[in-house]
Amino acid sequence: MIPGELMPLDGEIELNAGRPTVTVTVANTGDRPVQVGSHFHFYETNAALSFDREAARGYRLDIAAGTAVRFEPGQSRTVQLVALDGDRIVYGFNGRIMGAL
């Protein structure tokens, strides 16, 4: 093995297989683009994003790690969210939870 070498498996890899998901429609009501990263607690995103926040509590974007989704001003789009895993304790972000979900 060479340091940093990748040895991918043959075939398709399904991200977040078997994890609970929800779909929400998000509108950017602000005048600036908003970008949300793959592991950001979606419930706590920028206030300019209008969507069902309670449905998003405990969820993040269902996208590959290290990627993001950008919402342009005035844009509306539907995104799939996946449940946060592990102990489901959230600290930081915008400070709206600061503990167990």
UniProtKB/Swiss-Prot annotation:
GO terms for molecular function: urease activity. It is an enzyme of class 3 (hydrolase). Pathway: Nitrogen metabolism; urea degradation; CO(2) and NH(3) from urea (urease route): step 1/1. GO terms for cellular component: urease complex. Gene3D superfamilies: Urease, beta subunit. Keywords: Cytoplasm, Hydrolase. One of its GO terms (biological process) is urea catabolic process. The keyword DNA-binding does not apply. It is found in: Cytoplasm. Disulfide bonds: none annotated. CDD domains: Urease_beta (cd00407). The keyword Protein transport does not apply. InterPro entries: Urease_beta-like, Urease_betasu_sf, Urease_subunit. Its EC number is 3.5.1.5. It catalyses: urea + 2 H2O + H(+) = hydrogencarbonate + 2 NH4(+). Heterotrimer of UreA (gamma), UreB (beta) and UreC (alpha) subunits. Three heterotrimers associate to form the active enzyme. Belongs to the urease beta subunit family. This is Urease subunit beta. The lineage of its organism: Bacteria, Pseudomonadati, Pseudomonadota, Betaproteobacteria, Burkholderiales.
